[in-house]
UniProtKB/Swiss-Prot annotation:
Annotated Polar residues bias: 58-67, 213-223
Subcellular location: Virion; Host cytoplasm
Gene this chain is encoded by: P
UniProt comment concerning the protein's domains: The N-terminus is important for viral particle assembly. The oligomerization region is central. The C-terminus part contains binding regions for the RNA-directed RNA polymerase L and the nucleoprotein.
Region (Disordered): 58-77, 201-241
Name this polypeptide is given: Phosphoprotein
Region listing for Binding to protein M2-1, in residue ranges: 90-110
């Protein structure tokens, strides 16, 4: 007849289980070293015994594996962990012949804090539409040059020489546009100088003319005499003019 393990219930089972745990407690515990200090870490209500031989670090960037009993602990350096992810902009290759030109051009037009030499009246004057249109075209061409410089930086960074033709063509186009901009600037400057001369001449004439009298030129005098005399014999010929 088969034998079955005895079953225990209630308080009797609890007492027997307690005695069993006490009997096996000494089999799984090692003698403690009096020189080493133990620490108890509580994780989710579970007590875990950890000795000094296995330090546990959490959320720390400094790793120091030495303990208090080591005499040379002060001589060992602390090792700092490097960040896993770093964001750094890739610099433009130094062997690129157009990188310096592109950088200087960007700095020139981004840091242009000089005030305009035009006054409010000159900017809003209807006679200066042609000048402002020229300046707008110059601004557009400068923007195109900036775009071409950026394209040159990208194109010249390639490892192959297949883009040399494109790069040379763009350099030639850039030189042509710079020459056109120089011509536009000179024409605009000449027009501004001419307007300044006319304005100065008109100012000088207004300063000299202080009387209200109007002087007639010879042709105007003949016409005036003809109208005042009402004489049909005093007809004017082409030679009089």
């Amino acid at each position: 007849m088969e034998k079955f393990a005895p079953e225990f219930h209630g308080e009797d089972a609890n007492n027997r289980a307690t005695k069993f745990l006490e009997s096996i407690k000494g089999k799984f515990t090692s003698p403690k070293d009096p020189k080493k200090k133990d620490s108890i870490i509580s994780v989710n209500s579970i007590d875990i015994e950890v000795t000094k031989e296995s330090p546990i670090t959490s959320n720390s960037t400094i790793i120091n594996p030495t303990n208090e009993t080591d005499d040379n602990a002060g001589n060992k350096p602390n090792y700092q962990r490097k960040p896993l992810v770093s964001f750094k902009e890739d610099p433009i290759p130094s062997d690129n012949p157009f990188s310096k030109l592109y950088k200087e051009t960007i700095e020139t037009f981004d840091n242009n804090e000089e005030e305009s030499s035009y006054s409010y009246e000159e900017i809003n004057d209807q006679t200066n539409d042609n000048i402002t249109a020229r300046l707008d075209r110059i601004d557009e061409k400068l923007s195109e040059i900036l775009g071409m410089l950026h394209t040159l930086v990208v194109a010249s960074a390639g490892p192959t020489s297949a883009r040399d033709g494109i790069r040379d063509a763009m350099v030639g186009l850039r030189e042509e546009m710079i020459e056109k901009i120089r011509t536009e600037a000179l024409m605009t400057n000449d027009r501004l100088e001419a307007m300044a001369r006319l304005r100065n001449e008109e100012s000088e004439k207004m300063a000299k003319d202080t009387s209200d009298e109007v002087s007639l030129n010879p042709t105007s005098e003949k016409l005036n005499n003809l109208l005042e005399g009402n004489d049909s014999d005093n007809d004017l010929s082409l030679e009089d003019f």
